[in-house]
Amino acid sequence: HQIREHDNVVLAVGGGIGTPERAADLLTGRWSERHGVVAMPVDAILVGTAAMATAESTASASVKELLAQTQGVTGWVTRGAFEAGMTSGLSGLNADIHFVDNSASRAAALLDEVAGDETAVQERRTEIIDALSRTAKPYFGDVEHMTYAQLLRRYAELAAVGSGNRYQDGVWLDRTHRTRFQDLLQRTEARLHPNDTGLIESRFSDLESLNDPAVAIKQLLADHPAARVAQLHPADVDYFLVVCRQPGKPVPFVPVIDADVRRWYQSDALWQSHDPHYDADEVLIIPGPTAVAGISEPDEPVAELMSRFERAALDDLPTAPRTTLLDSLLTARTVEWGGAMRPNPLRRIGTWQVRDGVATWHSRDESAR
């Protein structure tokens, strides 16, 4: 009632509202009657999860299909459990979060079990690599066993997958992915150059020369054919991790299997659900565990979605309870009296009923008056 004392406040609620019926329940106020109080309608509802698969949503087509197939639950899913197409785990910020049950979320669950424990990680190293291989953020590979050419090709394979949209840098997912590739190329040039001292002029000082990474690698191999067979120097193995840790958009792969493997995996791990380059099974998807049940078909126009919610509320208006001042007074459990909340004295008299605007009451031992 304190909220309703302010005429400049609009009361909007959200979270778990996946169906028009649930929305109508809130807009008409029926929801509160289940708790033994008068109808308490809200002014607006917030639709989130239910709109994730609409035509206007930027989620990929396969993700929309999976959302429509996900049954959802009526309550919470405990951490690490899998129920009705949903699971629960930890986000990259160590907060509880719900995921759709798929290969990506199962990999996340595995990493939750070993996060921060180097011994446990190494004991399950093969299992972890296998789980990551089925996700959009695979293990990069054992860099210490790679040649320079293999390193560069693997990096380009995983990072140069951009479609050139306004958030990307040409074929690169981000400008910092381009600059990291430049760092790796120049490190290779320096390592394989015949001169051991002095400045070495790089062929790749201009970032525009990296618009096509395959061409850049071909140019490097023409200058330094030894890159095909030369295995990475131990110092360059460490340098690769330094490059991966540089500020900017996190790398789209797991560069090393260590105690921080969960952080590597969870960092920047949600955009893939909007990229058609990846299948829905490979990406983390985070709908509300209850509201996801309201998604019945992919690519429904959002206007039609809103119309369904609107119609359900309008259809319920004729039967929605009308709360009068008298209703509120007689059913209130407490009243404000003398600056304090006190038990409603009217409820001590007996049980009240309102018929045709007239109040009658029944005491415990007397008939209606």
Predicted regions and their residues:
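Alpha-helix-loop-beta-strand connector modules within alpha/beta enzyme cores
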Residues: 1-14, 18, 22
